[in-house]
């Protein structure tokens, strides 16, 4: 039995998210259909996480397990064959083989999401699919002050939408950076895991601070309430991307130096 691991990127605009849906097209459905054509049998794929409708990915990781197949000794052939039949908005970046102890979701030690804001009411044509225009001045200094209250380990129940069951709503944010590139502002959010719509709700709270709906320190009160009822509105999905998933050795095929667990602890 082999476990095949995929590194993939996709533009989520045309899809109802990662997970299969009864009446809508999903990334998972397209990937599984392509694999069935390549391997000649039904395939079920598990991902590192279920991105929502409209959300993109640069570094999504997924895996599937099947009895030996001649192609399993040629992972780059699998990559080439999949990319030949997948639509242009889904790309397999790499394929590797693993032992069956690896799991795309449960082996992950951290994820990094990126959210893009634009200062332009009429962004460049391709930016409208990947960046959100908030219709007010983006005040980086205020957003950075609010972001510092979210770093570290907290109960993020106020930032989680209903719809998922969790044994705990406690998560750790290692990084919450706001990078100003003039026209585009990028919010980089890295943590050991994320609740349903947590990143979009964090961005929503920072945007409320930016338009001075409340002061940066109010983030502490939102956290303390531990209730979504008083939480911030979610930012739109189309500007969010799953950028990277970190795994420990020996499963760090796609990792950067920042994925080392010791460096993650230092950032915390």
UniProtKB/Swiss-Prot annotation:
Its EC number is 5.4.99.12. GO terms for biological process: tRNA pseudouridine synthesis. This is tRNA pseudouridine synthase A. GO terms for molecular function: RNA binding; tRNA pseudouridine(38-40) synthase activity. Belongs to the tRNA pseudouridine synthase TruA family. It catalyses: uridine(38/39/40) in tRNA = pseudouridine(38/39/40) in tRNA. Gene3D superfamilies: Pseudouridine synthase I, catalytic domain, C-terminal subdomain (3.30.70.660), Pseudouridine synthase I, catalytic domain, N-terminal subdomain (3.30.70.580). Substrate binds at residue 113. NCBIfam families: hisT_truA.
């Amino acid at each position: 039995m082999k476990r095949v691991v995929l590194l993939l990127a996709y533009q989520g605009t045309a899809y109802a998210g990662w997970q299969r849906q009864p009446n809508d097209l999903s990334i998972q459905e397209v990937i599984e259909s392509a694999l069935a054509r390549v391997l000649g049998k039904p395939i079920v794929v598990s991902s590192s996480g279920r991105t929502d409708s409209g959300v993109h990915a640069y570094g999504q990781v997924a895996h599937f397990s099947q009895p030996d197949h001649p192609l399993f000794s040629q992972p780059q052939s699998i990559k080439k064959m999949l990319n030949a039949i997948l639509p242009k908005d889904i790309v397999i970046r790499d394929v590797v083989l693993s032992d069956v102890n690896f799991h795309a979701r449960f082996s992950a030690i951290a994820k990094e999401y990126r959210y893009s804001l634009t200062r332009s009411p009429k962004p460049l044509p391709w930016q409208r699919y990947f960046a959100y225009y908030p219709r007010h001045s983006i005040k980086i200094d205020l957003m950075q002050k609010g972001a510092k209250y979210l770093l570290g380990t907290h109960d993020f129940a106020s930032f989680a939408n209903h719809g998922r069951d969790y044994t705990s709503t406690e998560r750790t944010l290692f990084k919450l950076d706001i990078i100003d590139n003039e026209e585009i502002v990028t919010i980089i959010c890295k943590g050991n895991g994320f609740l349903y719509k947590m990143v979009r709700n964090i961005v929503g709270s920072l945007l409320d601070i930016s338009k001075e709906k409340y002061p940066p320190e109010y983030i502490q009160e939102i956290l303390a309430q531990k209730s979504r009822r008083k939480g911030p509105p979610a930012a739109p999905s189309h500007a969010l991307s799953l950028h990277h998933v970190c795994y420990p050795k020996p499963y760090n095929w796609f990792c950067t130096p920042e994925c080392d667990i010791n460096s993650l602890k230092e950032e915390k």
